Amino acid sequence: MNITPFPTLSPATIDAACKIARDQQIPLLISGGIGHSTTFLYSAIAQHPHYNTIRTTGRAEATILADIAHQFWHIPHEKIWIEDQSTNCGENARFSIALLNQAVERVHTAIVVQDPTMQRRTMATFRRMTGDNPDAPRWLSYPGFVPQLGNNADSVIFVNPLQGLWPVERYLSLLTGELPRLRDDSDGYGPRGRDFIVHVDFPAEVIHAWQTLKHDAVLIEAMESRSLR
């Protein structure tokens, strides 16, 4: 069994993946090169109270996370598999599958750990890549944690805050950007669109919530701010 974390991760997601790998003593496959969100990871690591000693600038995401896994979670080097060339979700899946296929022993089950905002799309991408292949691993989904938002007197906050979470504005930006990609229409990533992922069903209440967020003036302003570009 393998744990496979991917880019766009918050430190809280990294911790979730490393904890499983350490506790279960199973291999940890880390996927991620240098992409459009890498600077967000650099910033998150620099601000982390423990991980800020890790060198980041100019390095692939997977190599940074591998350092965290080894230095802070004491996962042996031989248990860490690094894929450091991918720059997007599709390449994460394709290159990781290729690496798993090189394993001496067949991998029957893999736990996919991703930032919760991208977990659904990542799973749909893996299932699209392997299709009906009977030799493909069984993909298990584990986002590590599920953020919940609430209102206080001043702003929107995380109800269940964890160390290393994205700022709320960054989280909402990622979340609202995922919904159009997950849709199975001409503009989405499903079979009727760009065919990057398997079909994903949308409950009516999710579509309604997305429409509400998409047209919220405060959120639009936040998403257009420099911090979310």
Regions found by a protein language model. Give the residues of each.
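A conserved mid-domain beta-alpha-beta active-site/ligand-binding segment of alpha/beta enzyme cores
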Residues: Q148-Q211
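Extended hydrophobic packing segments that form well-structured cores
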Residues: P203-R229
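A structural signal for short, hydrophobic/glycine-enriched beta-strand patches
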Residues: M1-V168, A222-R229
